[in-house]
Amino acid sequence: AEGIDTSAVAEVDGASGTALIEVDAAGANRIVVIPGANGWLTPDFTAAQVDRFSGASIALAPLEVPPDAVVGALRSARAAGMRTIVNTAPVPPDGLPEGLLDLTDIVIANEHEAGLLTGGAVTDRASALTAAHALRGRGATSAIVTLGADGAIWSTPDGDGHTAAYPVTPIDTVAAGDAFCGVLAAG
């Protein structure tokens, strides 16, 4: 229907994955993820799906599914010559699995996620840059730490920098990180 290939949709027992999003008076959000069917994804299943994207140049993976399934997808994407981007939302309770960042061309984390992953509070541009360097030190080729209204800090093999955010008055920041990742992937 409408040219959408649904042949890879797998029906499993249980409910669909759900995210409950609470938005405060300032427009900031807090998200609780209930994996549901997302938790059934396996490395073999995700790796097998990469062939469906022949001709694609970028694989973008969030962590709303089991991290080992993300690793399987990244391995296959890399083998297919794709550039890989990982959005660290939400950070798994046990942190990132071994090898995930080694398969990542660009890792994207917000201040909270970057702090959880690097063990240091990210409160300003300097601490965001420290976190970006730490993420690169763990294997990612490049790292971006988003800072909400203060834009983003980035670190690549060619250098580091800051990109300002477009000034807006937010009503609701739900999906801001997802939108950032999508726009980055689209180039």
Predicted features, each with a name:
Residues 2-3, 39-44, 86-92, 163-164:
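Short gly/ser/thr-rich secondary-structure transition/capping motifs
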Residues 34, 121, 164-165:
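Short clusters of small/polar residues that mark proteolytic maturation junctions
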